[in-house]
């Protein structure tokens, strides 16, 4: 677990909000909902490996939002990245390494595996909040569901749970 105070984690994500380029995720027929992916840096000049739109880095940033207590922002970035790579890209249903929004490379490396691991982590640890603590032989639940969700469920080999929200009561 991150030992930094929540305020510091929040501040780090605010840096992303204010200083890292946000690129709108748009498509014909996609309802405008403020979806956006991000570049890895704001450094110039733009060059390969300096300012990419890389799925693994975007997913790590989404996880950072969840870890900072900013579930809505984490979910929005997660969903934006899923839309970008799995629906709008040239290889539907796949996470490649680089988004087609990347100015230098465009969509490439469709069989690159590192985004899959971190996408799984942001889904399980960020959205569903399943945080294993092996040293203490426990699993901590700290879900990051969006405010407008009224139900969700997850099942892994180690844990399964259901979530429901009715008015002001969340039940797990």
Task: Report residues per predicted region.
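Carbohydrate-binding surfaces of carbohydrate-active enzymes
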Residues: 135-138
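Carbohydrate-binding surface patches
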Residues: 148-172
């Amino acid at each position: 677990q991150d030992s930094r105070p929540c305020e510091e984690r929040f501040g780090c994500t605010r840096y992303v909000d204010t200083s890292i380029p946000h690129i709108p995720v748009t498509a014909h027929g996609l309802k405008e909902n403020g979806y956006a992916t991000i570049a890895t840096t704001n450094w110039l000049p733009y060059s390969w490996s300096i300012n990419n739109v890389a799925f693994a880095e975007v997913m790590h940033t989404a996880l950072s939002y969840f870890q900072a207590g900013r579930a809505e922002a984490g979910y929005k970035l997660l969903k934006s990245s899923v839309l970008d790579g799995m629906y709008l890209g040239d290889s539907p249903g796949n996470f490649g390494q680089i988004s087609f929004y990347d100015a230098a490379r465009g969509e490439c490396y469709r069989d690159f595996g590192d985004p899959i691991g971190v996408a799984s982590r942001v889904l399980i640890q960020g959205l569903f909040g399943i945080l294993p603590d092996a040293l203490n032989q426990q699993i901590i639940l700290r879900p990051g569901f969006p405010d407008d969700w009224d139900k969700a469920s997850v099942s892994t080999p180690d844990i399964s749970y259901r979530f429901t929200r009715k008015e002001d009561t969340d039940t797990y």
